[in-house]
Each structure stands twice: as structure tokens, then as C-alpha cells.
Amino acid sequence: MNILVFNGSPKKQRSDTLHLSRAFLDGMCEAAPQEIHAIDVIDRHIEFCRGCFACKYNGSHCVLDDDMREILGQILASDLLLFSYPLYCYGMPAMLKNLVDRMLPLSSMAMEDVNGRYVHVGQRDFSRLRYLRRHRTIRRRVGRCLFRHLRHENFSIYLQ
């Protein structure tokens, strides 16, 4: 499995959140061989989305010439996306939110009903990423783990 990790912490490799994500990845590697690629988002040049929607009309190519072109290619080649980030002001850090906003070329303007919710249809087939939906609860559980006074606790129960 090809795993792409987005490290959204400004602390880069010293991030407590990344430490916990590494434990998750180590467990995945014990179960089966994995190919892991990590991106420190703070080190990448990613401009802000202009909202021009040119990517919707020119074959999903963004008009901005920055590192997102390479990152979008890596996303398309991945089987699993892991977003590792600390919670700042109840959400992800701005640099990671910017990266998520720039994933707009991967969706289309078309909408479809999925379990009573309308969502944008992808411009490409992302069916192999369905694995993420089953692990949605990991985010909630892991998010509660990183309080300073709990830093040295054993979190392996949350990763099972």
C-alpha cells in the first residue's frame, strides 16, 4: 500500500502529533509492507486558491505554478492519505487548510446524493481511498490523546 502523510505541524519532525502518527504507521507496517511518503507542509510552496475554478474547465489543471502540482500527482498515486496535525483554535493549522483547499482540482462541479448528503463527484476514480472511511473514528480518538499531561501515556489502545 502506498501511504502519503501530510505533516501539518509547524514543529515538523518534533511534532507530538507526528509522533503518534508514526506509531499508527509502525502498526500498519507490522501488518503488511507499506511504502510511506511524508510531506512537511510548512516546507512546501503552496499558494492560496484564487477560486477562479479554471481547474474545472481545463482538465483539472490549476493555473497556479507551485508545489501543489507535484503533491496532486502524489495524492493520485496514493492508496491512503494520512493528515497529521495539531488542533489549533479548534481546527487544522492554516498551512494544511490551504493544502486541502488546493485539492479542488480533484473534484468536479457535479453533485450526487451519497447516503442523504450531496457531495462533489471526483474528476477521477478514488475508490481505492474508501479505506479511509472505515477509520474515521481514529481522528476523534487520537485528537483527544495529545494533551500535555497525557503525553507519556500508552496510546496503543487507540490505534487498534
List each model region and its residues:
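N-terminal beta1-alpha1-beta2 submodule of the flavodoxin-like/Rossmannoid cofactor-binding fold
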Residues: 1-108
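Cofactor-binding loop segments of dinucleotide-utilizing enzymes, especially the Rossmann-like FAD-
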Residues: 8, 41, 129-133, 159
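Glycine-rich phosphate/pyrophosphate-binding loop and the adjoining helix
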Residues: 1, 12, 26, 30-31, ...
